[in-house]
Amino acid sequence: MDNYEFSELLKTLKNKVGNIASIIKPENIQTRLKEIEELENSPSFWSDVKQAGIIGKEKTKITNLLKNYENAFNALNDANELFDLANSENDTETLEALFNDASKLEDTITSLEISMLLSGENDGKNAIVSIHPGAGGTESNDWASILYRMYLRFCEREGFKVETLDFQEGEEAGLKDVSFLVKGENAYGYLKAENGIHRLVRTSPFDSAGRRHTSFSSVMVSPELDDDIEIEIEEKDIRIDYYRASGAGGQHVNKTESAVRITHFPTGIVVQCQNDRSQHKNKATAFKMLKSRLYELELMKQQDSANTGEKSEIGWGHQIRSYVLFPYQQVKDNRSGEAFSQVDNILDGDIKKMIEGVLIALKAE
């Protein structure tokens, strides 16, 4: 990097921070924080625990947003001042240090962008994730299990907690279906970027001839709904099936029909839960999953999303990302246009940067 390149970078970052400031309006955030502080000092505030909790979450979110803005604003100002001073004194050592720290400065601005992008109504919620393999038998089932592991590792990296709601093992390898709840700050905000079809190209370990195979898996993500959000489900629109939960190798793990499957006829959505030994608890969780999916479906309709509705055919039509392991190694996201060569790292859960690139790209559209 040289003087000209760094100068252009500073201009770009200054424009970004300026645009973000015009959107989030830091002065309005400060005013709102003062209002919340006054509310908290009122004796009657804590009598409504539910409302206090809602306002508490709002306070945390906007405090973090303001903090990220101030960090970015101050870092950019400091870099500008130091750059001007170093140039006026022909201080090559300081200039070199600034050039070396350019990526850190960019990361600070990116953190602000992501903080702004994750300030939506549902972004802070927990996420319900379901993975379904496409046609292709064992190969597709294995691909679904690879994706499942990738998300588990991502959750570990981010400090998210995972609760498996339903898991159906594949006959030879992999899995037929999995649903899990991800708990943590902005879990849905991040994982909503994974909604869609994921394509794998590789030499199949299940093909004795060593041929190249293409597999697809569908990932569906919806926010875990708060109790105050009401989704009406009519009894005539659903069918509830009860069956015995199965474990590894298809063995039944208990003697009662504790597992629950709910089919929603108008949308074709099917959810199932076998996480608990209690049929009653599994039924309650399955209804929660269904409401979450219906809510997500409505959000997609409102946003006029290309991925509206159930993915009736898993294939090229709704593909969001390709993972190529052979004849070369690359992961490419169709929405951001970004390509990554560190395939092993990505499949080991290092997907945060890729997700952030998608969030920024979608916001720019």
From Swiss-Prot:
Annotated InterPro entries: PCRF, Pep_chain_release_fac_I, Pep_chain_release_fac_I_sf, PrfB
Gene designation per UniProt: prfB
Keyword field: Cytoplasm, Methylation, Protein biosynthesis
Protein name listed in UniProt: Peptide chain release factor 2
Subcellular location: Cytoplasm
Residue positions, PTM N5-methylglutamine: Q251
Pfam name, any one: RF-1
Organism expressing this protein natively: Campylobacter jejuni subsp. jejuni serotype O:23/36 (strain 81-176)
Role played: Peptide chain release factor 2 directs the termination of translation in response to the peptide chain termination codons UGA and UAA.
